[in-house]
C-alpha cells in the first residue's frame, strides 16, 4: 500500500495526572487541549518553552503548510502545527501504543487533516520516495525529533535530504541532545539554532 494512501487511522515538560503522561497544545484553535501519551522509553515530547519558541519562528510559515512529523510520538508537534493553521500533517509513528493514542487524539480533536501512519520513519521515507509522483504535494515543513539515545537523526536526515519529498525553501526542524554531534546534509542551511538545558534544536532550510 502506498505511504501516501494508507488509512489515516521546562523547559516546562509534560504534566502527569491520574497516572497518565500529558502535554497541552499551547496555541491556535486547540489551545489548552490536553493530549495523553504512553510511558515508552525514548518518548520525550517537545516541552512548552521549546514549542513556543519554534512556533514563534514559524508564525508566518505554518498557515496552509503541508507538514511531515517523522517521529510523531506524543503528537506535540504535528497537532500543534494543525492547531495553528497547517493544511495537513502526515504523522509517522512506530510504537503501537503511541500510534493508537495519536489516532484517538485525531478523533477527539476532529483533526481530519492529520494522516497517521504506523511504520518507522526510515521505512516510510524509503517507500514514499520510491512512489513519489510529479505533481504530488511537496512538504513545506518537516519535524525530526527522534529519541535522543538511538542515534536515528543523522540517518533519517540524510534520507530526507536526498528525497523528492520537498522543494527548495522547505523548512526542517531538528531536535537532539546538546551533547550529540550531527553531520548535517550539505543541502541544509541553518536558519535558527538554540539550546535549552540538555536539548539543542534548530530550524534549517533546503537549498
Language-model-derived ranges and their functions:
Residues 1-207:
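Class I S-adenosyl-L-methionine-dependent methyltransferase catalytic core
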